[in-house]
Amino acid sequence: MIYLFLSCFILFIGVSVWERRTIWLGILFCLMLASAFASLLPFIQYPSLWFYLIFLPIILLLSVGPLGFALLCLYKSFQLLYKEGRRWSNFLSFALGLGGLLIIFSYSHTETADYIQHRSWLLAVYTAFMLLVFYFTVQLIFFTTASVLNFTFTFVKKADYVLVLGAGLLGDRVTPLLASRIDKGISVYQKNPGSKLIMSGGQGSDESVSEAEAMRNYALKQGVPSQDIIVEKQSRNTRENMRFSKTLIKDGAPVAIVTSYYHLFRALTLARQEKLKSFGYGAKTRFYFTLNAFIREFIGYLMQTKKWQLLTFLILACCYCIFRYLFN
């Protein structure tokens, strides 16, 4: 296991330096932690101080964590629905929390488990469903880890351009969410003398001006010189933010992408696909909103990589079926 840990550690450092805008950053970090944990197992005896410091918290996290996370999702979903309205997109954290509770109930409720075990067709459906749940849970862990690493351990780099991504308007004014992105973008711009601010965002059907124009007006009020602001007002989604902004950027110039924390990793993966030399900064948002929005971003990432996700799941499902056939 120590060799697996060293291999994962070396690969993790390599990915961190060479190309961190990938899910492999999260995969390697998780494998590194798991292999380090496994390497320590033979050396820690129960009871001992190291057992209580290392293993007991992990055991508690694995046993209580799923229930706590499900309840947290439900609590934050009620906050979101109360403060932001009952739109379908605001029910994602509620659905995740409720689904988590139902799965925990099916595992812990003896009569339900026995009912499923004695009906072969139901057991097959339940097994397939749980394989999907396990797969997407692991993917969510990798996605979350890669996201956190991309906005918490950003190497300080020189940016020639600071690209701020739009996020909807209130009439012709920026929302608090969008204002936080612009404020963060201005902060990054001020730390990079000679850089240009790119405001990227199109005009929705219910908006009187484009997001980019409203963002520009906000930045001007904050004291940013007009000659340092570039407007890109054709984009309708994150991929178009990258694609259309690229035409305004000198080839090979380093770009700092600024968006909300929950949106940053997927934005960086799209920037990589559009061959932008980029790194990212996250703007703060309220946690009740971030949790639901992060789930939406995860779904967006799954759709963005759907071919690879389907292929990977089918391979793992086949491996599981072969294993069950050989050892059952």
Name every feature range the model reports, one short phrase each.
Residues M1-V156, A253-P254, V258-N328:
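Extended hydrophobic blocks
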Residues H118, L122-L123, V138, T144, ...:
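A structural signal for short, hydrophobic/glycine-enriched beta-strand patches
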